[in-house]
């Protein structure tokens, strides 16, 4: 899967026709900004994006490059716009594309709710059709499902992934795609359904095929849109520099107008930059432990299995679970018992066709990929700005809720996790605006020395985060093997013995920790050593959180 994703990213970056215009003139009005102004803004946005994304990656939290870039541009442009408003009497709307900015912001966050609801509804219907024992229900359904899925993915590739590729733009087939999208989808569905049925008769795993196609299409669309959009900021800065050096003719950087950014990009060798960015991201997929941790966070929140929860409980999550359970009980009164029993039977997991150790089965994986691709296609066709990160994450959360992956014991923890992640997105937006505003102001006031300081700040932040991440990884290597064996075991006697051993180890650890904490407190009080007492207090808080995690694990083991 990683290999397919890497190929998709590389091809998506290679076939893109150039950077998106939002970095050049989507937020700011370049005709009112000088070369010095735009360089302050572009450096501020680049620094903000790197700092914020590295922080979120270190925390293992998914976030959006699109949101950080858009709000960074808005914050940096606003900082320089205030200078022009005070000095030249211009209005904010003359300096900032307020309508475009509001459209981008509204479209991004609206996609969050739509993706969650669509993922929930479609996954519920799909599970009703296939059940968890899906291999017994493929004879008459796999052709329709596989045909629709592959047709949607192919349509997604043609309209989004390869949309800007010269091969599609300058060919007869490309014109047919643009002029007859409905016919293309119908023909593709019929042909794909026939091919899928033949492959199924040949005992080919259709779900794996759909997953590989979906992974490729999403990766390629991300590289062709989000990646290009993201590196559009430094590329716009490079083009501004080249234009200034070639056409300034003695005009100072503070006086040289950057109206050229309102025109289409003419940066030479832009495809080489895009391919280079694709190669870097491809390497990062294989080697970056931070990226793997971000993916693992999403998998943990959507896992079908009961495992060690990363997030703790919260009052909001408990209230939400309580209200949902009350609502379900009221709705259940109006649904016949026979219908409820039939639906519950379709969601029976006793004989689930799921490989041991995986987070969820192939049915849900295919739904996540196909739906994410479809929603991005629809948004692109209507020219609505979307974040692939937000769409993919919320589809996964909606499908996991529909799949009853959030049980009574795990729902409060996972809802807390979703709230934390979504809240982090709003924090990304606010932090990007404020940080870019401050850095752009600093660049404008401090000049070259301030810009050098910003670059040093980026280096310091990344080094500090990497050290913190390595320490976190060392702590995470202490895997609770007994708990994993309890979760994966189907033998109740074996689970009971493992639970006894786990409880014994927990008590031994807590007694030893209590002894060390008590020694620290008594030493601090007798020797009047405040540092010793503070250290003991910190250890006590850590042990309390660890004890809570142990208790949750043992409650799960008792089930």
Regions found by a protein language model. Name each.
Residues 1-493:
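Multi-pass alpha-helical transmembrane bundle typical of ion/small-solute transporters
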Residues 468-559:
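Cytosolic, long alpha-helical scaffolding segments
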């Amino acid at each position: 899967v990683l290999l397919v994703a890497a190929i998709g990213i590389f091809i998506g970056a290679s076939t893109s026709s150039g950077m998106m215009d939002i970095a050049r003139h989507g937020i700011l009005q370049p005709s009112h900004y000088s070369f010095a102004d735009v360089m302050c803004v572009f450096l501020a946005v680049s620094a903000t994006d790197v700092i914020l994304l590295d922080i979120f990656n270190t925390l293992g939290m998914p976030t959006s490059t699109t949101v950080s870039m858009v709000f960074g541009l808005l914050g940096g442009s606003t900082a320089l716009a205030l200078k022009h408003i005070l000095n030249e009497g211009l209005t904010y709307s003359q300096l900032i594309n307020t309508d475009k900015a509001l459209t981008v912001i509204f479209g991004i966050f609206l996609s969050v709710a739509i993706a969650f609801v669509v993922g929930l509804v479609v996954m519920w219907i799909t599970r009703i059709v296939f059940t968890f024992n899906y291999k017994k229900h493929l004879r008459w359904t796999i052709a329709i499902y596989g045909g629709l899925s592959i047709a949607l993915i192919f349509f997604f590739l043609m309209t989004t992934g390869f949309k800007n590729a010269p091969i599609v733009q300058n060919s007869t087939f490309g014109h047919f795609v643009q002029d007859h999208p409905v016919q293309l989808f119908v023909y593709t569905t019929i042909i794909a359904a026939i091919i899928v049925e033949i492959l199924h008769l040949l005992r080919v795993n259709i779900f794996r095929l759909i997953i590989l196609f979906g992974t490729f299409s999403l990766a390629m669309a991300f590289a062709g849109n989000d990646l290009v959009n993201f590196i559009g900021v430094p590329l716009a800065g490079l083009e501004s520099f080249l234009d200034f050096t070639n056409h300034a003719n003695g005009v100072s950087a503070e006086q040289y107008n950057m109206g050229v950014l309102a025109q289409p990009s003419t940066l030479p060798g832009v495809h080489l930059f895009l391919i280079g960015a694709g190669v870097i991201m491809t390497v990062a997929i294989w080697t970056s432990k931070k990226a793997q941790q971000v993916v693992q966070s999403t998998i943990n929140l959507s896992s079908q299995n009961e495992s060690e929860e990363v997030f703790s409980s919260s009052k909001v999550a408990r209230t939400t679970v309580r209200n949902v359970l009350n609502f379900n009980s009221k709705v259940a009164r109006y649904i016949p018992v026979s219908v409820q029993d039939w639906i519950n039977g379709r969601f029976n997991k006793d004989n689930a066709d799921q490989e041991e150790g995986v987070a969820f089965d192939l049915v849900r994986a295919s739904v996540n990929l196909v739906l994410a691709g479809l929603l991005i296609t629809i948004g692109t066709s209507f020219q609505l700005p979307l974040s692939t990160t937000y769409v993919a994450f919320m589809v996964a959360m909606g499908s996991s809720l529909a799949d009853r992956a959030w049980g009574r014991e795990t729902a409060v923890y996972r809802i807390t996790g979703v709230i934390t992640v979504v809240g982090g997105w709003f924090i990304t937006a606010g932090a990007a605006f404020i940080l870019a505003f401050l850095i752009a102001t600093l660049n404008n006031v401090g000049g070259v020395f301030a810009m050098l300081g910003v670059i040093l700040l980026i280096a310091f932040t990344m080094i500090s985060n990497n050290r913190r991440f390595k320490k976190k990884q060392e702590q995470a290597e202490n895997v609770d093997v007994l708990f994993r064996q309890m979760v994966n075991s189907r033998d109740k006697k074996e689970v009971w013995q493992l639970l006894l051993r786990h409880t014994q180890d927990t008590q031994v650890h807590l007694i030893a920790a209590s002894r060390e904490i008590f020694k620290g407190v008594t030493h601090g009080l007798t020797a009047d050593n405040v540092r010793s007492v503070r250290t003991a207090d910190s250890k006590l808080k850590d042990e309390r959180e660890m004890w809570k995690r142990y208790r949750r694990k043992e409650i799960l083991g008792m089930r």
